[in-house]
Amino acid sequence: MVRSMRSRVAARAVAWALAVMPLAGAAGLTMAASPAAVAADTYAATRYPVILVHGLAGTDKFANVVDYWYGIQSDLQSHGAKVYVANLSGFQSDDGPNGRGEQLLAYVKQVLAATGATKVNLIGHSQGGLTSRYVAAVAPQLVASVTTIGTPHRGSEFADFVQDVLKTDPTGLSSTVIAAFVNVFGTLVSSSHNTDQDALAALRTLTTAQTATYNRNFPSAGLGAPGSCQTGAATETVGGSQHLLYSWGGTAIQPTSTVLGVTGATDTSTGTLDVANVTDPSTLALLATGAVMINRASGQNDGLVSRCSSLFGQVISTSYHWNHLDEINQLLGVRGANAEDPVAVIRTHVNRLKLQGV
């Protein structure tokens, strides 16, 4: 009975995960950007440009229609910030010659050439935080700060789960077929129709085992000791360049009681009869994926990334009532009644960077 219950939970989670994947978090390295809003003030006018870095399954603008960072770039611009949005492969590893890290590095250099600035402030969501860390490690002189939002620095238990499910096929055909469809999807939603997509490499990148390897290859003072569920230093100096390090994440998905070996989960971002449960399909989907993570000992999470995994540098908060997409104001600005305003949180943080002189 317990095994049957777990199987049903797993099957539903995979289905819901596939439904939400298009919205989660290619190397279109053009400098095209949305028209800058007229600045009402200089609240977010940092010394160095801000680059927003998307995560898994992302792009700068889905199918050239919907912003990944929904409403965030225009808000920052209206407060005086110079903001650029990277457009990387939606499905790819972070390291390697074709990786997202090298794509982002090329984009950083373009932004610097276009603006005359000497450094940038990187703000990455989900996998975008790992990508940002790559650039800070290999080209430290180009980076002033790294901020990660809901980033799986220690990997994602849900990525482990998906990988384990795929391994149950002895032929390996399911992995190949699913990856082919996901790669095509990545090309279609990319604003530049980027064909550099590798879904299986992206999945491996986000597993707990592979992120441990990544952290050894690209260490950062912002990381705490492995297994400690602690953050690291608020600053680091790499090659003579100092980086300010920040993070935050959502923990809307919380464990409840355990029955027959299966622990339940609740979404603290939503209230009773919350409209987000109806108008935003990712709300229930991320509750399901978060439940899978809880049953793999993740603890509280945002549906894809646990609290412990998100810790990096100076932790602004891990108490936001957000799921993984709420962190970037998705889906289309809809969020639960208890969820904080992510646009305001990011605006306040960019002001924090301004006050720090970067």
UniProtKB/Swiss-Prot annotation:
Found to be superior in improving overall detergency. Disulfide bonds join 229-308. It catalyses: a triacylglycerol + H2O = a diacylglycerol + a fatty acid + H(+). Changing residue 324 to A: Complete loss of activity. Its EC number is 3.1.1.3. Catalyzes the hydrolysis of triacylglycerol. Belongs to the AB hydrolase superfamily. Pseudomonas lipase family. This is Triacylglycerol lipase.
